[in-house]
Regions:
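Conserved N-terminal alpha-helical segment that immediately precedes and caps sugar-phosphate-binding
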Residues: 1-558
Length: 558
């Protein structure tokens, strides 16, 4: 081991205790899924049902929150903000950042399609740590810096007329808490929602305590226990936040449209019932996609509406399961992603224009900006390429389908939601673009049209189509997690191939090694930093990035 790796490990142990997060429920193993790998080994249907049990915890939390004064305050403050000409701004990072973008786009899409509320389109915004670029390619280390969040609030120009809804699954994400701090300074009304007990966060983490105990912050504690996959807050944590924040936003829209909002807790309960009844269909899809990967094939999802929902799930697979991330059209060296997303009826610029109903909002920060914000020297020297021009290099439209079907064993999957499945234009476009793929399949979430994999749900129509978005999220989360369990990238219910790209994930990797390998935190930390250094030295850009956690665990078996 080099002295540099040892110093880094000891620095993490001694000086980064605010990122030692094993005490948080969202970072712990759920007793409901402790044998998740064994359940899937028995059958994929058993595995799906095991995962679905944890979603019931979200329902119990939702019933409590929807009756709470804090939720009523969120809705009423939102209504007043819109009525007074202010803006509702959602902020988040990673999964919650993608959720923030999705919420904004759901609002804008409704305004675009309803003339009576068109004037309100520019009253809902989102702040995604890393900007819109991070929707399709994780910018993981950005979350470690509060100042980055503050700067994005400054660039948004928030003031006393505006309202911030900050969403952080764990309640401790630095960049999101930075948006809280800056919005408060600017006189904005601030709401903060997260999925760990507020008192526990305030007791242990200074950055969380400053926000939670601030009298200017209205806290919504959505605690609903550990995740179905330990530490994977893209699952139940973000599900609960999408349900609560989305429910509030849709109630605000219902007020503008003079409509009666649904009973969201009851609607969510019905959705869970229907998805549990569809467990065999979800399991069948899991087995199909897993087999494609076993044979070294690729999967490309095709969709028109709900494309942002699919982006969210596929992007998050990369850091969670150590899969190759999306690659740009001019990158001929990096390994191709296992899963990708394309629209068969629009070009890449049209995909973003139609999906967002606004210009791309990417970060255009310079080395001087990073210096002023106190970023590390490595970032200042080599700033990440996350501008709009770089985002457009990901060909998510109808262009170049041949790059996704060159192995002889690749699959094209058309994803439809509700009545969209009957669109002849979409079906014909899919038939044309998928002609070169070995397999062409259709995954239908709701609707009455025939499909290879049919998930039967009956979401009632509503202004923002919230329950349809919830259905897509739950189906894809369950499927993508199940696929990785089947392929051996989950041990028990631990994401044992996690990519340690920021401080929180480094801590998670250390605890994983300690849990599975049966050694102490300090020794696990030293071994992980050593592995990261060794693997970086031997890294071949054209090859898939190896897992440092797996490297350590495999070495311990020898």
């Amino acid at each position: 081991m080099s002295e540099k790796a040892y110093r880094q490990a000891m620095n993490f142990i001694e000086n980064e205790k605010q990122f030692h997060l094993g005490f948080l429920p969202t970072e712990q193993s759920s007793p409901l899924t402790k044998n998740l790998d064994k359940e899937f080994a028995a059958s994929s249907v058993d595995g799906v049902r095991c995962l679905q049990r944890v979603d019931r915890n979200v329902l119990e939390m939702a019933k409590r929150i929807f009756r709470s004064g804090e939720f009523a305050g969120l809705v009423e403050t939102g209504k007043k903000t819109i009525a007074d000409g202010g803006r509702i701004v959602f902020s988040g990072c990673g999964a919650t950042g993608r959720l923030s973008i999705l919420l904004e786009c759901m609002w804008r899409d409704c305004c675009f399609k309803n003339e009576s509320v068109k004037q309100h389109a520019d009253q809902v915004f989102s702040i995604m740590t890393g900007g819109d670029y991070a929707l399709v390619r994780s910018v993981e280390f950005f979350e470690d810096y509060q100042e980055f969040g503050r700067q994005q609030v400054r660039e948004m120009g928030m003031d006393g007329n505006d309202m911030l809804v900050a969403i952080t699954e764990g309640g401790e994400t630095s960049s999101v808490l930075g948006t809280v701090d800056e919005a408060l300074r600017r006189g904005s009304k601030v709401f903060l929602m997260f999925n760990n007990p507020a008192d526990l966060l305030a007791e242990h983490l200074e950055r969380s305590r400053q926000a939670i105990r601030n009298p200017g912050v209205c806290v919504l504690d959505l605690h609903c226990g550990p995740m179905g996959l330990a530490g994977s807050t893209r699952m139940q944590a973000t599900t609960s936040e999408q349900l609560i924040a989305g429910g509030a936003l849709e109630m605000i829209m219902c007020g503008l449209l003079k409509q009666v909002p649904p009973d969201y807790a009851a609607a969510f309960e019905t959705l869970l019932d229907e998805l549990e009844a569809s467990a065999p269909a979800i399991a069948s899809y899991i087995d199909f996609e897993a087999e494609i990967y076993r044979k070294k094939g690729k999967v490309t999802y095709f969709a028109d509406d709900f494309l942002l929902d699919i982006f969210t799930d596929t992007t998050e697979r990369s850091p969670t399961f150590m899969l190759p991330p999306f690659r740009k059209k001019d990158d001929k060296i990096s390994p191709p992603p296992w899963a990708f997303v394309k629209n068969p009826v629009r070009t890449t610029p049209e995909v973003w224009e139609n999906g967002m109903h606004r210009p791309l909002r990417c970060l255009e920060w310079t080395p001087e900006d990073y210096r002023r914000m106190g970023a590390p020297e490595a970032i200042r020297r080599n700033p990440p390429q996350i501008r709009a021009a770089e985002l457009l290099k990901f060909e998510v439209g109808m262009e170049s389908p041949e790059e996704r079907c060159d192995s002889g064993g690749d699959a094209a999957v058309l994803v439809t939601v509700g009545g969209q499945g009957g669109s002849p234009v979409l079906q014909q476009a899919f038939d044309r673009i998928s002609a070169g793929f070995r397999y062409q399949k259709k995954l239908a979430v709701g609707g009455d049209c025939p499909a290879d994999f049919k998930i039967t749900v009956s979401c009632d129509a509503s202004p923002l189509h919230l329950m349809e978005h919830m259905a897509v999220k739950l189906v894809l989360n369950t499927a993508s997690t199940g696929i990785m369990v089947v392929l051996g990238r989950v041990t028990g219910n631990w994401m044992s191939w996690v990519d340690v790209t920021n401080k929180k994930l480094m801590d998670r990797g250390i605890r994983l090694i300690s849990e599975i390998g049966g050694i102490g935190y300090e020794e696990s930390c030293i071994r992980l930093f050593e592995a990261v250094e060794e693997l970086e030295k031997s890294r071949i850009p054209a090859k898939e990035k190896p897992s440092a956690v797996q490297y350590v665990l495999n070495a311990m078996k020898k």
